[in-house]
Amino acid sequence: MTRLRIDLAYNGAAFHGWAAQPGCRTVQGTVEEALRRITRMPDAGSLRLTVAGRTDAGVHATHQVCHVDVPDQTLGQCVGHMNLTPVQALQTRLSRMMPDDIAIHGISVAPAGFDARFSALERTYVYRIADARVPWDPRLKDFAWRTDRELDIAQMNAAAALTLGLHDFGSFAIANPGGTTIREVKTAYWQRVPTRPLLGPGMGERYHTPAVESGLLCFTIVADAFARNMVRSLVGACVQVGMGKRDVDWFAGKMRVPLREGSTGPIAPQGLTLEHIAYPADDELAARAERIRAKRTL
């Protein structure tokens, strides 16, 4: 049996999230179905992807990582007439079978001890907002949340700073069965993307076209892991602060008392993108997976 690491990206707009669900189009279901066709393993449970970070319906990923265990003989059969290694052949075939909203960026033999979910050191998410400071670009409808209010980025950053460190995010997340909402946030900040005009040499003002993300508000958050709905709920709370509906003291109170209730529900999914998954050195993978499986406490 060979464990393979798969790096991929996807536009989540037309998917019901990552996780396979009967009767729903999902990223996991689409990739697994293609793998079964390539390997001629029709059993639905024969090839199961384990993912670094499950994304909800409408959420995107520019760098997602998963692993799958494939029988050695089955992997060898992927070559067929190709003058490629088995792994290269599988990547080529899988890439060709993907719809336009999924891209396979790489397949490799995973090092010993690698687990896409439990070996990960940290995950990076970015949430994008178009507020009243910038004219609305309809091309962003699937990739940014829109508001006709101008948001106070200084107040939003004051709230975001309170999330740094090890905390119980019970006010902003749902725990998995038997799990907790304790997580360690390493980075959390808001910034406005500078205007980046696409202006070539010798072009006049009429060609002064801003890059598509110019002026957007972006929330970047890095943590060892995230509980369900955690990022979108934190964004939603920061937005309430940025609009002046709530103050930073209210946000601080939610951090102090981890109680889930309606005022800290998740914001719309389309603005959220999983941007990066980081892993330790190969010789630290197994130990990392063992540590992260332990139930966290404060």
UniProtKB/Swiss-Prot annotation:
UniProt function note: Formation of pseudouridine at positions 38, 39 and 40 in the anticodon stem and loop of transfer RNAs.
Q: Indicate the family of this protein.
A: Belongs to the tRNA pseudouridine synthase TruA family.
CDD domains cross-referenced by the UniProt entry: PseudoU_synth_EcTruA (cd02570)
Instruction: Name the enzyme group at the top EC level.
Output: isomerase
List UniProt keywords, sorted A-Z: Isomerase, tRNA processing
Q: Is NADP one of the keywords UniProt gives this record?
A: no
Name of this chain's protein: tRNA pseudouridine synthase A
One GO biological-process annotation of the entry reads: tRNA pseudouridine synthesis
Any one GO molecular-function label of the UniProt entry: tRNA pseudouridine(38-40) synthase activity
Subunit structure as annotated in this protein's UniProt entry: Homodimer.
Cell wall biogenesis/degradation among keywords: no
Output the superkingdom of the source species: Bacteria
Q: Which reaction does it catalyse?
A: uridine(38/39/40) in tRNA = pseudouridine(38/39/40) in tRNA
Locate the active site: 56 (nucleophile)
EC code: 5.4.99.12
**UniProt binding sites for substrate:** 125
Q: By which gene is this protein encoded? A: truA
